Amino acid sequence: MQPGGQPDMSALLAQAQQMQQQLMAAQQEMAEAEVTGQAGGGLVTATVKGTGEVVGLKIDPKVVDPDDVETLQDLVIGAIEDASNKAQEIAAQKLGPLAGGFGGGGLPGLPGF
């Protein structure tokens, strides 16, 4: 604080720049992170990036039944949802503390922030 109770603008600016750098680093980490989710006890696994992009899908041949496509569809959706939930948890861990530094207003465009 400067005399008269005024905040030191240069200190506030430096703090904002530091927070911006931390946020950018965390966002880059999330963009590069890959998380795997599974369904059916591992019969179907899905890999998503921290951004939510699905980058991999593995299906055990045992679960492929032409007469029961609906079960396979449910397992694929379940695996993708599991991976997406894990990615959101990681994002909350990495970005959540930074969001608090923005006055509690959250981060626009990021779910849960």
Curated annotation (Swiss-Prot):
GO-annotated molecular function: DNA binding
Database matches in Gene3D superfamilies: Nucleoid-associated protein YbaB-like domain
InterPro entries given in the database record: YbaB-like_sf, YbaB/EbfC
Record flagged with keyword Iron: no
Primary location class: cytoplasm
GO cellular component assignments: bacterial nucleoid; cytosol
Keyword field: Cytoplasm, DNA-binding
Compartments reported by the entry: Cytoplasm, Nucleoid
Entry function: Binds to DNA and alters its conformation. May be involved in regulation of gene expression, nucleoid organization and DNA protection.
Family named by the database record: Belongs to the YbaB/EbfC family.
Quaternary structure, from the entry: Homodimer.
HAMAP family xrefs: DNA_YbaB_EbfC (MF_00274)
Record's protein name: Nucleoid-associated protein RHA1_ro04210
